[in-house]
């Protein structure tokens, strides 16, 4: 079973993330940031991973620390659940449309953290959610999961649609990358022999 649980406690946030990479898309989400919960639900449902995330943060100031630290903790949990990466596909990609919006996400479990985030948001906020926090979420994730992640919103007018297609595509790309490949059972997916 590829399951991991990580707890992260700082003076700003207290976060617990549990993930099952071989799940069915079930989720239990309570981050205190409703729009973040909505986006995490997209990862679970479209990535077919089970997510149980609870966060308490200094949201009386703003949502920044909570959103960033959930990304960090999720990255740590994914890295722990993937383990030595033997037998995984390593790479994943997805294009996801939602009405006028279209996004592409490509991920590589390379062991080299890197984020290319190109989303020309049409608004600064979706409800009360600051769209810049999505960058902080993914930066925290890549730095602690040890992945290279390319996120491109190819078109979109509605900022909610733009970000929702990003999170859905991320879930689907993650699912593809961590999927076990029977033909590569027990092998590290790299000519170097390590990732």
UniProtKB/Swiss-Prot annotation:
Record-level GO BP terms: L-histidine biosynthetic process
Protein's UniProt keywords contain Amino-acid biosynthesis: yes
Keywords, ordered alphabetically: Amino-acid biosynthesis, Cytoplasm, Histidine biosynthesis, Lyase
EC number: 4.2.1.19
Cytoplasm recorded as keyword: yes
Gene Ontology MF: a single term: imidazoleglycerol-phosphate dehydratase activity
SUPFAM superfamilies linked: Ribosomal protein S5 domain 2-like (SSF54211)
Primary enzyme class: lyase
Gene Ontology cellular-component annotations: cytoplasm
One Pfam family here: IGPD
Catalyzed chemical reaction(s): D-erythro-1-(imidazol-4-yl)glycerol 3-phosphate = 3-(imidazol-4-yl)-2-oxopropyl phosphate + H2O
Compartments in which it is found: Cytoplasm
PROSITE patterns recorded: IGP_DEHYDRATASE_1 (PS00954), IGP_DEHYDRATASE_2 (PS00955)
UniProt pathway: Amino-acid biosynthesis; L-histidine biosynthesis; L-histidine from 5-phospho-alpha-D-ribose 1-diphosphate: step 6/9
NCBIfam families: PRK00951.1-1, PRK00951.1-5, PRK00951.2-1, PRK00951.2-4
UniProt record similarity statement: Belongs to the imidazoleglycerol-phosphate dehydratase family.
Protein known as: Imidazoleglycerol-phosphate dehydratase
Organism expressing this protein natively: Burkholderia thailandensis (strain ATCC 700388 / DSM 13276 / CCUG 48851 / CIP 106301 / E264)
């Amino acid at each position: 079973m590829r399951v991991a649980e990580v707890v992260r406690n700082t003076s700003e946030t207290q976060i617990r993330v549990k993930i099952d990479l071989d799940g069915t898309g079930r989720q239990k989400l309570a981050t205190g940031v409703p729009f973040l919960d909505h986006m995490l639900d997209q990862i679970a449902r479209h990535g077919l991973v089970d997510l149980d995330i609870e966060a308490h943060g200094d949201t009386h100031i703003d949502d920044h620390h909570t959103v960033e630290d959930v990304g960090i903790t999720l990255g740590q949990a994914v890295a722990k659940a993937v383990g030595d990466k033997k037998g995984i596909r390593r790479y994943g990609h997805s294009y996801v449309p939602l009405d006028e919006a279209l996004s592409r996400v490509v991920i590589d479990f390379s062991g080299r953290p890197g984020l290319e985030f190109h989303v020309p948001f049409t608004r600064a906020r979706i409800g009360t959610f600051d769209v810049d926090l999505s960058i902080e979420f993914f930066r925290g994730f890549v730095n602690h999961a040890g992945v290279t992640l390319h996120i491109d919103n190819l078109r979109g007018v509605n900022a909610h649609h733009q970000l929702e297609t990003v999170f859905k595509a991320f879930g689907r790309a993650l699912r593809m990358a961590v999927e076990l490949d029977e033909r590569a059972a027990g092998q590290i997916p790299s000519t170097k022999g390590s990732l």
